[in-house]
Curated annotation (Swiss-Prot):
It comes from Schizosaccharomyces pombe (strain 972 / ATCC 24843). Pfam families: Metallophos, NadN_nucleosid_C. This is Uncharacterized protein C1039.02. Residues 1-24 form the signal peptide. GO terms for molecular function: 5'-nucleotidase activity. The lineage of its organism: Eukaryota, Fungi, Dikarya, Ascomycota, Taphrinomycotina.
Length: 601
């Protein structure tokens, strides 16, 4: 498949202009050796089965420093093809689904212009049956346009974006992807699929996201759910499967019309492994993030399927329901199993019942070569410096000496974010903990690690000059108190030794038994104070803040002074580089370069 707009090269100086010369270093495995002798639990196949990925965020080349999740998408393709073969051998159905967010998080996706064109192309090699859109496909108009023009057509109507539209070249609104698709599985299950994005409002102005509750009232949706030729409603979406009204509303709208028809939900966005119950014939699965997890779901007891009943799984019993109350109860319960597969070659081989020599397919091997070539084209082995020790995101307290957040507050923010014209003015710097996507590990640090740590190229540090300190000093508590700390489960990154998942069916979903690792919550807000006199507080300070906080900062200051004094006209970019590389990811790269470039010797 030819994907237009794929560049032949991006220009080293353009991407990596932080230092004048570079040395390429091969990736080093910095984690302890994976215990391949630990127990891997087999999959249970039903009449209808699903392989699910979500929130891959560009990690298609694998976690090069972590054996637990080291498989690349070439090995995943071999896994997918072998699983399709197994499904045919067993005489059952297998569908592959992805629920969005294909970039923002890895050099393979983010070092291209626009972001995602390499990883989008890699995705087209995979035998996905249904896909849907994520919010990260919509933040930037260039990404939305490229995805809509070159990626969506490849899927021939199976890329669904039921509540997302885009302005075309004639400035007319059209569907970003399909509203729905109808198909009959190999074993006779008449399936109607729809794909939704959560009620997202931070999209670029070339796209429109219709709230799910509004989409439900539309004529096309009502026509679809009133069809009488449907054995299974397949709802996929970039929406967390737990505690979201979007899913509850969609489920209720169908269940009121079809009391007994199975409704299968596959979600995403919250970056966790999860399985949630809606009713006796409706469950939901979320398959993690960052190519750390392949989600697996099987359904048995489908009367519409001509596949042989497998007699696996368990019915929904007394689990807490995610659905709205007082809905019709399905008369015939179904039987379900779920697994969360660690994204590595060993587990893929185990589940496909292949040896080391027999596992790879020619197509998978070829895709691994393509991925390696793309990494070379993007020069992802370039090195800014070498980190002398690990700095952790969630494994230690944010106040610990080896916490990445303490490193940011004590060193990165005050030492990198320098404005020569204002450096003598006392200032506070406000940043967000949620912008950090992982730990900094000992060893080489290049563009790949930079984007893994912080992929937000549209985040800049702005400032308001000469704010009375009596107001500025209150901003931290106001911003930090605006919402509770993020759920630590949202940040289960590549922890050692692995995931321990608890969901509505219990704690046996992980295919590999891991040791539980306690984690610390990620702080909402980080603050550094720079240039303060130790004996007295300043009268005024510069307030430096990530543009992510801009609206909230202005609102908070105006509320404190009880009038609208501070507006966008008071805001100026604080950290500015001549080469234009002054968005938040490059803050980390510059710090590594200026502090640790000599550690590579």
């Amino acid at each position: 498949m030819k994907l237009s707009s794929l560049p032949s090269g991006l220009g080293l100086a353009s991407l990596l202009g932080l230092i004048s010369s570079a040395t390429a270093y091969s990736a080093t495995d910095l984690t302890t050796m994976y215990d391949w002798n630990q127990i891997i639990k087999p999959l249970e196949w039903g009449q209808l089965n699903f392989i699910h990925t979500t929130d891959t965020h560009g990690w298609l080349g694998g976690h090069l420093r972590d054996a637990r999740y080291k498989a690349d998408f070439g090995e995943f393709k071999s896994f997918a093809l072998r699983m399709k073969e197994l499904a045919d051998f067993k005489g059952v159905d297998l569908l592959m689904v992805d629920t969005g967010d294909l970039h923002d998080g890895n050099g393979l996706s983010d070092a291209s212009d626009p972001q995602g064109i390499y990883t989008n192309n890699i995705f087209t090699y995979l035998p996905y049956d249904i896909l849907t859109i994520g919010n990260h496909e919509l933040y930037q108009a260039a990404i939305s346009n490229n995805t809509h023009e070159y990626f969506v057509p490849h899927w021939n109507g199976t890329y669904l974006a039921s509540n997302v539209q885009i302005y075309n070249s004639s400035n007319e609104l059209e569907q970003f992807g399909g509203e729905s698709t109808y198909f009959i599985t190999k074993h006779g299950v008449r399936t109607l699929a729809m794909g939704f994005l959560f009620n997202f409002s931070s999209n670029a102005n070339n796209t429109v996201v219709t709230p799910v509750e509004t989409a439900i009232k539309s004529e096309w949706y009502q026509q679809q759910i009133n069809r009488t030729d449907v054995d299974l409603f397949l709802l996929i979406g970039h929406i967390p499967v737990r505690d979201y009204d979007e899913w509850k509303s969609l489920h209720a709208s169908i269940r009121k019309v079809h009391p007994n028809t199975p409704i299968q939900i596959l979600g995403g966005h919250s970056h966790i492994r999860d399985f949630a119950v809606y009713d006796e014939a409706s469950v939901s699965l979320e398959g993690g993030r960052y190519c750390e997890t392949v989600g697996w779901l099987s359904i048995d007891g489908l009367s519409a399927s001509n596949a042989t009943r497998q007699y696996v799984g368990r019915p929904v019993t007394n689990e807490t329901r995610q659905s709205y109350p007082n809905l019709p109860k399905p008369a015939t319960p179904l039987y379900y199993t779920r697994r969360y597969i660690d994204f590595n070659r060993q587990n893929f081989r185990f589940h496909t019942q292949q040896s080391e020599d027999s596992f790879d397919t020619p197509e998978g091997v070829e895709l691994s070569k393509v991925i390696k070539q793309y990494r070379d084209d993007l020069n992802l082995s370039y090195v800014f410096g070498c980190i002398p020790k690990n700095y952790y995101m969630t494994e230690v307290s944010p106040q610990a000496e080896d916490s990445i957040f303490k490193l940011m507050v004590d060193h990165i923010l005050p030492e990198v974010l320098v404005n020569e014209n204002r450096s003598s003015v006392p200032h506070i710097i406000i940043s967000n903990g949620g912008g950090v996507r992982g730990s900094m590990y000992e060893g080489t640090f290049g563009p790949d690690e930079m984007f893994q740590l912080n992929p937000f190229l549209t985040n800049y540090y702005n400032y308001i000059p000469d704010v009375p300190y009596k107001y500025a000093k209150k901003l931290y508590s106001i911003l930090n108190g605006g919402s509770t700390l993020r759920n630590v489960n949202d940040y289960l990154a590549a922890l050692n030794p692995g995931y321990v998942t608890s969901d509505d069916f219990g704690e046996d979903g992980d295919d590999t038994v891991h040791t539980y690792v306690s984690t610390y919550a990620v702080p909402n807000v980080l603050q550094a104070q720079v240039g303060f006199n130790t004996t007295s507080a300043p009268e005024t300070v510069d307030v430096v803040f990530l543009n992510y906080f801009q609206t909230k900062v202005l609102k908070a200051l105006n509320t404190m002074v009880n009038e609208t004094i501070y507006t966008l006209s008071n805001v100026t970019q604080y950290w500015v580089r001549e080469d234009g590389k002054d968005s938040s990811p490059y803050m980390f790269a510059q710090y590594v370069q200026q502090e640790w470039s000599d550690y590579c010797d």
